[in-house]
Amino acid sequence: MEIIEADEQHIPAMQKIYAYHVLHGTASFETQPPDEGEMSARLKKIQEAGLLWLVVLHEGEVKGYCYLGRYRERFAYRHTLEDSIYIDPGFQKRGAGKALLRRAIDWAESHGYRQLIGNVGDSEN
């Protein structure tokens, strides 16, 4: 496995992974999967905010992704981020999510963030 920063070339694979989780789980809190254009806009928003979006690659293919977004916009939450992790259903239970989370935690700590919040919305995790 290789973990790298996400870019536009990863959008189609990330959209496919996310669409699966929207349609077959409850963790995303969305009911309709966003299209590639919306996924691209989300990636751009995270990157323009100076935050982190990673993909995990296996044999050159995107098998999951993780990003850190602002938890709340209020000033008191300025050191708090929320993590989101989505793994290809055929690649789960291989440590990809754990590896992404470790990298996200390390990045957050090195950038002065003090809290990382993850909401788990699916009891089958």
Residue ranges and their predicted role:
Residues 25, 94, 111-114:
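Short coil/turn segments at alpha/beta junctions that flank glycine-rich nucleotide-binding fingerprints
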Residues 2-14:
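A short beta-loop-alpha structural element at the N-terminal edge
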Residues 15, 19-43:
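Conserved GNAT-fold acetyl-CoA-binding loop/helix
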Residues 108-121:
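Conserved GNAT acetyl-CoA-binding A-motif
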Residues 92, 118-125:
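Conserved beta-strand-loop-alpha-helix junction that forms the acyl-donor binding cleft
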Residues 2, 28, 82-86, 117-119:
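Short aromatic/hydrophobic contact patches that present stacked aromatics
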Residues 33-90, 101-102:
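Acetyl-CoA-dependent GNAT
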Residues 93-106:
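Conserved acetyl-CoA-binding loop-helix of GNAT-fold acetyltransferases
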